[in-house]
Amino acid sequence: MGDITVKNLSFSYGGDERLILKDINMEIEAGEFVCILGQSGCGKSTLLRLLAGLEQPTTGEILMQGVSAEGASLDKGVVFQDYGLFPWMKAGENILLALRQRFPKKDKKELKQTAVEMLEAVGLSASVYNKFPKELSGGMKQRCAIAPALSVDPPILLMDEPFGALDAVTRARLQDMLFDLWSGQASQKTVFFVTHDVDEALLLANRIVVLGQSPSNIIYECKLSDEQRPTRETRFDNLETMKLRNELIRQINKDVVTHIS
């Protein structure tokens, strides 16, 4: 059994008969970096919220490491696009909040040192510890939002368009940071990453899944070896990469045309 198992999953909101997701089946192995693509409104974020335990399936089942995915858990780190920092707390205090849940017996000094180390791990200086979110740039806020999710060392990381609101330069830096954090670990985390951006998926993922229009199910997926995954510098030079890029775009747009017609 994989790290994440989705069986015959369907979902509708509040008793609404209109399904958002229909008959989703997916097995994600430990250490995979899976990117989910699809048009706006197809249910990508809804699927992530279901995996996070923030919503419950209408029918079907979700298992995380063999256990039903009901409610929040320290085994799942979740990062959203809107930073998710408490504005009245300093950056370091936001991280401490997560650390105290994971390590309730550690003393304050040890927890603070861990929080500083997590800030440094996401490319921020120790001085950021004492800054409030309003004092930080968008890129710094998002790094701070990723730090609490990583600080509790969850085996599974769920990310919902975490870089979608950032400028191109900051986005590229954080993409590289995330990939380096994921690929540099002896025991790689399982990452489930929602994005609209085909190029972002190609840069980060070793598996890409495309959802169709609502009611969504999986209409296409592919795996990328380390050799197939492009670098930022070579992504437009590799013919196979460009073929795959065009196919992903075709699959997404094909389903839109089908629903319009």
Set out the residue ranges of the language-model regions:
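ABC-type ATPase nucleotide-binding domains, specifically the catalytic core motifs of the NBD
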Residues: 14-15, 89, 93-110, 121-122
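The feature captures the beta-strand-to-loop junction immediately N-terminal to the Walker
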Residues: 37-39
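Helix-to-loop junction immediately C-terminal to a conserved catalytic motif
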Residues: 52
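Conserved ABC transporter NBD signature motif
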Residues: 60-72
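Conserved ABC ATPase "signature" region
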Residues: 107-127, 179-180
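Conserved ABC ATPase signature
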Residues: 132-136, 140
